[in-house]
């Protein structure tokens, strides 16, 4: 704020280092890319205890595979203690948001598939559906384009329209959804998926969400989605372990239950897995934003997240975490 700069944060506002290193998808990722593609410097320790400090502009041949591994798969062979990231100048943000009906959601998904890189779409599907359309207004052309969308979105009377000074001013998802209260008596799991365009499948997708929501075991379970694409499809000078660069959508399934209630936990995890199975045809890949080495799905998730690069990751782990101190592959 002091320097009128920002970093493309996620929907939970204050990003931790885990958000950055697992990929880091923001409402502005279509313009600025993923968080891992904006890394400049990384410090930390390997699983074998050795310290490292890497700078993107001063990598030797041996360090390049390490840098690439840190971008999306760091927890398996390293502990990161410090990062330096590229920041960007702040610009006004136009937001259209509100509760919508299932039919309106289908139409909005279709409209969002044609958005330019400065606009993105995200929503949460629970007992009610709440959507966010976020647009950065950097140029006069983009301000004029925002007026065009304002006219289009007037067809959706529940959508509010507001311009914020910058992205940091926005509080995503209202308390009226009644699902975000931090409760020490509940545990949760999240599984994140990745997939290509939904063009032509908007209706089928929303119908699946309706059935998934109807089957949820409690009000704290939900499905949400973020749009990516454009700049997030491109890596910077080095590759990464976020391999599914063709992805246009990242849905996540949030599953929560009362702690120490093993029956509820089993029911909720089963619901999460069933929701995943239902959504696989639209989103066949995994964004490994949360590790599940304690769940039966861990190996499948690794394969769907890293694909053919999994063997390279195993090589990094063998070299830098030979005692398997860090999460397993």
Segments the model singles out, each with a brief description of its role:
Residues 1-329:
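Soluble FAD-dependent oxygen oxidases
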